[in-house]
């Protein structure tokens, strides 16, 4: 079985890691030219480039013109010519420390005209040029020797591939190129599993071997109607896709409501087998990550739980308002916290409070979920409801209820296990045995 993703999103990662735990997957393919894919995943746009050695580029190592200056912090960086911004540096996703993934170069009017794409080996492996209207025109991919290997025309959609000692190959679109790539790998493509109805579905639909048996994993909401391509899967006997897995229970039930009963056996509800990084140790230690000094009811919560240590971390300097929290003996502050320090704090804490206003910092709720922290918050501040059980979200006026929930969870192992069970169930967690058995049934194994 081959996994096929448009991009390595959080949803793709959850599916990939769940399948990896079962041992059922042969290979994962990501169409997006992502230079920071983890080991075990391939992109057709980077596969032929030959990069295998090197370290990621640190933000201040980006080549710039004389007298231009690189300015950056833990969140972003830019390149300036005196006072004019000439480029924006994008970091690799996740908890990585200022590692360069993309540089957007601007003209004197501030429009992006060129984007340099970097990989985890510190190389600029591709360059995209843009029109005056900021529309992508062309992406050129170069190999480890600096030779042009791939050229993608974003206007016409065609792709040119030039391999050493071979004639140039022309592909009219991504579907043709990806189909060639899968054939070139000389692997069994009789079963594809994919998670969007865009390019991956079209690869399945146009695959020359019509005898295959593919699976769609639908990870998006459903509203008033079934998408057209999903309807095609349900109604046609001539498509390779035979089953539709829906991880979210509410979305699965909505799919049944929107379709005729005769199609219901094509839908399967199956969540994810998440890869938790550690156990919860029932420690009286709570973590808050924030980009703001507006933390809802933090004084009241800290005062009501004097035996709980509250660790508040920010990647910037803290305001005097936050620094005043040091008057509470059970509060510890971490300003200008590095990604490494934040990872340490996740290891120290067993509760996460999603109570900061403004933006979420470094996918904090998801990170807390992966570290098996019990997550609680307020409806007025919640950043990611997917990983927080509904019983653990409160109105900002319900401080007493939140405090009592924390006390109950910390009272004994069974109470914490029950609270974490609600959290996992809400996030569609499935134990490995059930996940493996269900997936094998879907795949026909």
UniProtKB/Swiss-Prot annotation:
UniProt-listed InterPro entries: GtfB (IPR014268)
GO process terms (BP): protein O-linked glycosylation via serine; regulation of protein stability
Subcellular location: Cell membrane
Pathway: Protein modification; protein glycosylation
Record has Membrane as a keyword: yes
Membrane topology: Peripheral membrane protein
Domain of life: Bacteria
Keyword vocabulary terms for this entry: Cell membrane, Membrane
Family recorded in the similarity comment: Belongs to the GtfB family.
NCBIfam families: accessory Sec system glycosylation chaperone GtfB
Domain notes: The N-terminus of the protein, including the glycosyltransferase 1 domain (residues 1-171), is required but not sufficient for full formation of the stable GtfA-GtfB complex; the complex of GtfA with truncated GtfB has intermediate N-acetylglucosaminyl transferase activity.
Description of how the protein assembles with itself and partners: Interacts with glycosyltransferase GtfA; probably forms a heterotetramer with 2 subunits each of GtfA and GtfB. Part of the accessory SecA2/SecY2 protein translocation apparatus.
Function recorded in the entry: Required for the polymorphic O-glycosylation of the serine-rich repeat protein PsrP. A stabilizing protein that is part of the accessory SecA2/SecY2 system specifically required to export serine-rich repeat cell wall proteins encoded upstream in the same operon. The GtfA-GtfB complex adds GlcNAc from UDP-GlcNAc to PsrP, attaching the first sugar residue. Stabilizes the glycosylation activity of GtfA. Has no N-acetylglucosaminyl transferase activity on its own.
Note: Encoded in RD10, a pathogenicity island with an atypical GC content that is associated with invasive pneumococcal disease. Pathogenicity islands account for greater than half the genomic diversity observed between isolates. The main function of this island seems to be correct synthesis and export of pneumococcal serine-rich repeat protein PsrP.
Annotated protein name in UniProt: UDP-N-acetylglucosamine--peptide N-acetylglucosaminyltransferase stabilizing protein GtfB
Organism annotation: Streptococcus pneumoniae serotype 4 (strain ATCC BAA-334 / TIGR4)
């Amino acid at each position: 079985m081959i996994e096929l993703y448009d991009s390595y999103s959080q949803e793709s990662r959850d599916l990939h890691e769940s399948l990896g735990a079962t041992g059922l997957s042969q290979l994962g393919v990501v169409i997006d030219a992502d230079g920071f894919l983890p080991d075990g995943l391939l992109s057709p746009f980077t596969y032929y480039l030959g990069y295998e050695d090197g370290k990621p580029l640190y933000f201040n190592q980006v080549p710039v013109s004389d007298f231009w200056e690189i300015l950056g912090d833990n969140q972003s960086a830019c390149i300036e010519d005196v006072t004019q911004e000439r480029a924006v540096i994008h970091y690799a996703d996740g908890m990585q420390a200022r590692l360069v993934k993309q540089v957007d170069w601007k003209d004197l009017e501030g429009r992006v005209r060129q984007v340099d794409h970097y990989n985890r080996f510190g190389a600029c492996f591709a360059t995209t040029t843009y029109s005056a209207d900021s529309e992508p025109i062309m992406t050129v991919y170069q190999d480890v020797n600096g030779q042009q290997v791939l050229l993608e025309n974003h206007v016409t959609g065609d792709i040119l591939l030039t391999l050493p000692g071979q004639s140039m190959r022309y592909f009219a679109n991504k579907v043709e190129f990806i189909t060639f790539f899968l054939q070139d790998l000389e692997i069994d493509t009789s079963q594809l599993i994919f998670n969007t109805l865009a390019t991956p579905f079209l690869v399945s639909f146009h695959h020359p071997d019509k005898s295959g048996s593919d699976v769609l994993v639908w990870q998006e909401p459903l509203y008033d109607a079934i998408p057209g391509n999903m309807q095609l899967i349900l109604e046609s006997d001539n498509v390779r896709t035979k089953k539709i897995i829906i991880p979210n229970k509410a979305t699965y039930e909505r799919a049944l409501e929107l379709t005729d009963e005769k199609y219901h056996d094509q839908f399967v509800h199956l969540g994810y087998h998440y890869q938790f990084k550690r156990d919860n140790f029932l420690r009286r230690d709570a973590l808050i990550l924030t980009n703001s000094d507006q933390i809802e009811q933090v004084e009241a919560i800290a005062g009501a739980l004097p035996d709980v240590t509250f660790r508040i971390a920010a990647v910037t300097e803290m305001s005097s308002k936050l620094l005043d929290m040091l008057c509470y003996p059970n509060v510890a502050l971490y300003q200008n916290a590095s990604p490494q320090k934040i990872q340490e704090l996740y290891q120290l804490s067993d509760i996460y409070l999603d109570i900061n206003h403004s933006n979420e910092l470094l996918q904090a709720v998801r990170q807390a979920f992966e570290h098996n922290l019990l997550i609680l918050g307020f409806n007025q501040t919640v950043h990611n409801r997917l990983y927080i059980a509904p019983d653990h979200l409160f109105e900002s006026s319900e401080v007493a209820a939140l405090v009592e929930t924390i006390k109950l969870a910390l009272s004994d192992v069974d109470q914490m296990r029950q609270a974490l069970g609600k959290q996992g169930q809400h996030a569609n967690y499935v134990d490995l045995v059930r996940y493996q058995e269900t997936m094998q049934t879907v795949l026909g194994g």
